[in-house]
A protein has these predicted regions:
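Accessory beta-strand-rich segments of carbohydrate-active enzymes
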Residues: 9, 20-131, 153-154, 168-172
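Beta-strand-rich binding/interaction modules
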Residues: 60, 141-183, 192-193
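Short glycine/proline/serine/threonine-rich loop/turn segments at secondary-structure transition edges
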Residues: 40-44, 83-89, 157, 189, ...
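Internal, hydrophobic beta-strand segments that form the core of beta-sheet-rich folds
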Residues: 95, 163-165, 208-211
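Predominantly extracellular/luminal regions of secreted and cell-surface proteins
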Residues: 1-7
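A beta-strand/beta-hairpin structural motif
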Residues: 73-75, 180-183, 189-199
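Solvent-exposed, conformationally flexible loop/turn segments
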Residues: 27, 87, 141, 185-189
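Short, solvent-exposed loop/linker segments at the N-terminal edge
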Residues: 134-142
Length: 211
């Protein structure tokens, strides 16, 4: 069951040092069998790991997806080319190696945060593909800048229009922006930039944490 840290149940020994909380270094494996439903046919499937500590290698159906030496950032791998047809058994394995360099604090060992499958259409907003800033903010008006990375995994170019909305806690639309029609080439990604103007926004304060 994830999240998981295999070190916390090991025996303490001073020979390992404080950086590992006096717990042993080592290599561990995670294995998972799963069957995709028919609804995933023709769609894009990725695996997202919020955190693996550390030096991880991920495999799907015998194919090595990649190696990540670091342990404090999320990891995304595209599974689509290597998956079996819906209804057939898939096998995933993750190798984790905690030997070698360590931080100055206890960082755990294994898949210490959540992991999940991300299923999308061929044309979709990329994972972590929404970037929002507020370049202008006052009690009278605010401007929200949104950059959205649209990914096209299909074999031909696609025409895309994005509609962004800002809603309050009740669902009322406070601002909206429809982008121009853009072309996203086959196998590429494109950043769509939009601005939304808010009139008399409810500003965030500790007493009124409006988001």
């Amino acid at each position: 069951q994830l999240p998981h840290d295999w070190n916390v149940k090991q025996d303490f020994d001073s020979k390992w040092g404080g950086a590992t909380a006096y717990l042993p270094e080592g290599i561990g494996w995670y294995q998972k069998e799963f069957i995709l439903p028919a609804s995933t046919s023709g769609r894009q499937v990725s695996i997202v790991f919020d955190g693996i500590f550390m030096q991880s290698d991920v495999y799907i159906n015998g194919h090595h997806l990649g190696h990540r030496p670091y342990g404090f950032c999320s990891i995304v791998y595209d599974l689509t080319p290597y998956l079996k047809a819906p209804g057939e058994l898939n096998f995933m394995a993750v190798r984790v190696n905690t030997t070698g360099g360590r931080p100055r604090w206890y960082a755990g060992a294994g898949i210490y945060r959540h992991a999940w499958l991300d299923v999308t259409e061929d044309v979709h907003v990329d994972t972590y593909g929404t970037y929002i800033t507020t370049p202008q903010v006052s009690a009278e008006a605010a401007q929200v800048a949104v950059v959205t990375t649209v990914k096209n995994s299909s074999p031909k170019k696609q025409y895309v229009t994005l509609l962004q909305k800002v809603k309050d806690a009740t669902g009322k639309v406070l601002a909206k922006s429809r982008s121009q029609r853009v072309v996203v080439e086959a196998g590429k990604a494109f950043d769509v930039k939009q601005l939304l103007d808010l009139v008399q926004p409810k500003l965030w304060t500790p007493e009124s944490p409006t988001l």
